[in-house]
């Protein structure tokens, strides 16, 4: 269990299943289309305003495949965490599972890290490794996600309350 309360889900894909799940759980959702804004900074300003209005202490990214601008980093730097499907610093970026699979690594894993201005380059909070020698990238993806979910909760639970910098 996590001693925290989810106060807002921000999603850049209106209609995504996560929005439906959040609504069923009573979590407020802000779903937006980036193309409806003049710039990344413009939609991030809206996000920061909503986070500030709700007193958000920690921003947890999951499946948010966009690089954050200075707007978010300046407002919430040291208070943004991300889950990444590789043992960082190896296999940064959006195709980490496929890249690691094609490279032929035998030990895979996931990383929870702070977000900074370097792609998947923030301070590592937690990692978990596992062996995989199969030949099916979809099976590997399923294994990665099975490891990601509990590790993310454990890592967030282990952060000192109110001291995320």
Task: Give, region by region, the residue ranges found by the protein language model.
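Short phosphate-binding loop-to-helix
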Residues: 35-61, 66
């Amino acid at each position: 269990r996590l001693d925290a309360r989810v106060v807002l889900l921000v999603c850049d894909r209106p209609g995504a299943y996560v929005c439906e799940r959040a609504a069923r759980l009573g979590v407020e959702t802000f779903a937006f289309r980036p193309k409806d804004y003049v710039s990344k900074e413009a939609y991030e300003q809206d996000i920061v305003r909503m986070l500030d209005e709700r007193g958000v202490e920690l921003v947890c990214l999951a499946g948010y495949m966009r690089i954050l601008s200075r707007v978010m980093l300046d407002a919430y730097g040291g208070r943004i965490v991300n889950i990444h499907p590789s043992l960082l610093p190896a296999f940064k970026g959006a195709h980490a599972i496929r890249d690691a699979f094609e490279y032929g690594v035998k030990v895979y894993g996931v990383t929870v890290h702070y977000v900074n201005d370097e792609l998947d380059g923030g301070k590592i909070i937690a990692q978990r490794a596992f062996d995989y020698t199969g030949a099916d990238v979809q099976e590997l993806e399923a294994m990665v996600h099975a490891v990601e979910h509990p590790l993310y909760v454990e890592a967030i639970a282990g952060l000192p309350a109110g001291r995320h910098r």
